[in-house]
């Protein structure tokens, strides 16, 4: 083998020194080329054999028996030629398998066996761990996967181009979303940035709910407000249902738009209101969630944090808003129109549901004052309570509950009060819930608490009874054990009171007499022995 390499090296030197185009050297040059090709197959074969021989017995790659038989047969065919040995006996089954694999190759030449050995190695080289021998084999073999890559290059390029196009489209969409102007909410002169995901869903729901966008023109705004924003005055009276409606003019301005699309002003809407009596007046106005009205004077916008009960769930974003809800359980209200508190109007009988068309004229501030602490003023998401003499809760601007605050309540609709129901509370709460009777709810809650306390008390009594039983049982057991110990027969001491020693007199006498008895027994034994000898 080494001679073959030396010959190939000499032939390579000769090829470099002697020109190949001479006619007298063509046969020698052909022989040298054959030697070079044979040397390549041989070097590859040697590298593959080194890889197989370097595999550890307990390594990660474990070839199968069939694979090892193939490598064995190709190796024997490449090194020794065709099989000329006799088949081993039955006592050597492994040798018989090897002989069968080797002899199955027949008259295959050594070069073909080397090539077949290397080809089999190419099939498993990817699953083998990367070692120095494997690196050497790969360097000798060269890039044998180049043809496979050329066949699939067109298809892979098409797939990659399609993927790149999809990725570029996604990036363009993302860039458009990022570069678009963010929505802004303006509440009380302060802008709030809106979340992209939640606000987009909210805007879609709002676009389905509202009919069309409001224009900047005041006349068109008035027409649309007649369709979408009806100002209803709903009056309930538990005592009298007779009365008529007089003109009251309300000036309400839309201060800002919540979604930042447009800032609009709503012209004053005139209302006709009847003569007031002992009843509760509920003013409901259906508006979109995109707008918030400010009532002039002492009325101002309040945030959701002012209310005790509120809800910001996504399901209620698309619902309409109502301006205010003023209810009373059983106490009258006094209304001061135009800011003159010297001219109050007491509640009187009204019709329950009155649709007030817009009229002409304006009024000043409308103040609602609870008389005798019995009235309730509910706003937005706040739920009023009948405090009946309790101190008024201070608001943000230092104002008490005597004045109505207009707040933004999300997701509430027009609520109509029923007549003559005492203790019934109906408010435009932002959480979409309506509380029932305060007394009923408190009563049911008190009953539940009382029931829970009774059950807890019963459980505690049961536990105490069990503890008492256990204590009595343990006490009885302790007493019985002590009594048995006391009643047990104690060993009577045989020692008299005058005896000075610790041991009893009988033990002492036995200890003293025992040596004499032993000596006497020994004496008797020797005496009998002497008699026998004599």
Swiss-Prot record:
Q: Which GO terms describe its cellular component?
A: cytoplasm; cytosol; membrane; nucleoplasm; peroxisomal membrane; peroxisome
Basic and acidic residues bias located where? Answer: 207-225, 376-385, 431-441
Q: Which Pfam families match?
A: ACBP
List residues of the ACB domain. 41-130
- Phosphoserine is found on 193-194, 196, 200, 215, 279, 313, 428
Q: Which residues form the signal peptide?
A: none
Q: Which CDD domains match?
A: ACBP
Query: Which PROSITE patterns does the protein's record reference?
Result: ACB_1, ACB_2
Binding annotation for an acyl-CoA: 52-61, 72-76, 98, 117
Gene3D superfamilies to which the protein is assigned, alphabetical: 1.20.80.10
Q: Which GO terms describe its biological process?
A: fatty acid catabolic process; fatty acid metabolic process; pexophagy
Q: How does it sit in the membrane?
A: Single-pass membrane protein
Keyword field contains Transcription regulation: no
Which domain of life does the protein's organism represent?
Eukaryota
Give the UniProt subcellular location, in the record's own words: Peroxisome membrane
Parts forming coiled coils? 190-219, 447-476
Q: Which family does it belong to?
A: Belongs to the ATG37 family.
PANTHER family recorded: ACYL-COA-BINDING DOMAIN-CONTAINING PROTEIN 5, ACYL-COA-BINDING PROTEIN, ACBP
The record's function comment reads: Acyl-CoA binding protein which acts as the peroxisome receptor for pexophagy but is dispensable for aggrephagy and nonselective autophagy. Binds medium- and long-chain acyl-CoA esters.
- Name of this protein: Acyl-CoA-binding domain-containing protein 5
- Which species? Homo sapiens (Human)
- Lineage of the source organism? Eukaryota, Metazoa, Chordata, Craniata, Vertebrata
């Amino acid at each position: 083998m080494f001679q073959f390499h030396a010959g190939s090296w000499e032939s390579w030197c000769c090829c470099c020194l002697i020109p190949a185009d001479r006619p007298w050297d063509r046969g020698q040059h052909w022989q040298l080329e054959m030697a070079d090709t044979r040397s390549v197959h041989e070097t590859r074969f040697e590298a593959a054999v080194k890889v197989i021989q370097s595999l550890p017995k307990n390594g990660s790659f474990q070839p199968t028996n069939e694979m090892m038989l193939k490598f064995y047969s190709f190796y024997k065919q490449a090194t020794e030629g065709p099989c000329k040995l006799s088949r081993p006996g039955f006592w050597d089954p492994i040798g018989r398998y090897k002989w069968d694999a080797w002899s199955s190759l027949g008259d295959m030449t050594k070069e073909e066996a080397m090539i077949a050995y290397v080809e089999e190695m190419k099939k498993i080289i990817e699953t083998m761990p990367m070692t120095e021998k494997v690196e050497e084999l790969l360097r000798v073999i060269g890039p044998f996967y180049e043809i496979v890559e050329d066949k699939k290059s067109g298809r892979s390029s098409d797939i990659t181009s399609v993927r790149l196009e999809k990725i570029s489209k996604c990036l363009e969409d993302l860039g458009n979303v990022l570069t678009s102007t963010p929505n802004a909410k303006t509440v009380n002169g302060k802008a709030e940035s809106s979340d992209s995901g939640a606000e987009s869903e909210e805007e879609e729901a709002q676009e389905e709910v509202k009919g069309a966008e409001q224009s900047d023109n005041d006349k068109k705004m008035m027409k649309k407000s007649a369709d979408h924003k009806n100002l209803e005055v709903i009056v309930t009276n538990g005592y009298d249902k007779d009365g008529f409606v007089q003109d009251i003019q309300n000036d309400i301005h839309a201060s800002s738009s919540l979604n930042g699309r447009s800032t609009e002003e709503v012209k004053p809407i005139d209302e006709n209101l009847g003569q007031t009596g002992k009843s509760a007046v509920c003013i409901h106005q259906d508006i979109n969630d995109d707008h918030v009205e400010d009532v002039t004077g002492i009325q101002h916008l309040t945030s959701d944090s002012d209310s005790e009960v509120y809800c910001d769930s996504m399901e209620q974003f698309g619902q309409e808003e109502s301006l205010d809800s003023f209810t009373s359980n059983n106490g009258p209200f006094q209304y001061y129109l135009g800011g003159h508190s010297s001219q109050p109007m007491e509640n009187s009988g009204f019709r329950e549901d009155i649709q007030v068309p817009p009229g002409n004229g304006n009024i000043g501030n409308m103040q609602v004052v609870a008389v005798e602490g019995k009235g309730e003023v509910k706003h937005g998401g706040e739920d009023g309570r009948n405090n009946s003499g309790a101190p008024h809760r201070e608001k943000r601007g230092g104002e008490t509950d005597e004045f109505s605050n207009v707040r933004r309540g999300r997701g509430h609709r027009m609520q109509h009060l029923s007549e003559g129901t005492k203790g019934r509370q109906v408010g435009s709460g932002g959480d979409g819930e309506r509380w029932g009777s305060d007394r009923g709810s408190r009563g049911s809650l008190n009953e539940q608490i009382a029931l829970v306390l009774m059950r807890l008390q019963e459980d505690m009594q049961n536990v105490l009874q069990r503890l008492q039983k256990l204590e009595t049982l343990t006490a009885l057991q302790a007493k019985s054990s002590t009594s048995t110990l006391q009643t047990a027969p104690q060993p009577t001491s045989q020692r008299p009171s005058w005896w000075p020693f610790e041991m009893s007199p009988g033990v002492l006498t036995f200890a003293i007499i025992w040596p004499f008895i032993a000596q006497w027994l020994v004496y008797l034994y020797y005496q009998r022995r002497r008699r026998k000898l004599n």
